[in-house]
């Protein structure tokens, strides 16, 4: 899998150094595997993984953070969308598609 944009992932590490090890573990799993979709990711990543409106949400560092991406299994590309603390993440109304789009940006197809 190829990550677009690794720069944003590194920025998350810089902003939240306590999450560095967990983020790097996630990245290594993604980089080393030829992702076949959400089920493959769920099987390879022992922490909670959710999917909402085409976004895949990973719990990072014992549920302290959320890493949100879009996975395109066909092109084998993962688009980094956002990295939130649990407090930031919980403020988003996940039942409101427009709010989610506003916070995370457009879905790539």
Region roles according to the model:
Residues 1-64, 73-77, 86-109:
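Basic, Lys/Arg-enriched alpha-helical interface segments
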């Amino acid at each position: 899998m190829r990550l677009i944009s690794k720069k944003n992932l590194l920025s998350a590490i810089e902003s939240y150094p306590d999450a560095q090890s967990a983020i790097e573990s996630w990245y290594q799993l993604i980089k080393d595997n030829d992702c076949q979709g959400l089920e493959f990711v769920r099987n390879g990543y022992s922490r909670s993984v959710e999917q909402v409106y085409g976004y895949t949400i990973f719990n990072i560092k014992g549920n302290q953070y959320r890493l949100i991406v879009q996975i395109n299994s066909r092109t084998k590309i993962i688009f980094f969308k956002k990295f939130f603390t649990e407090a930031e993440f919980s403020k988003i109304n996940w039942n409101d598609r427009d709010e989610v789009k506003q916070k995370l940006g457009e879905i790539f197809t």
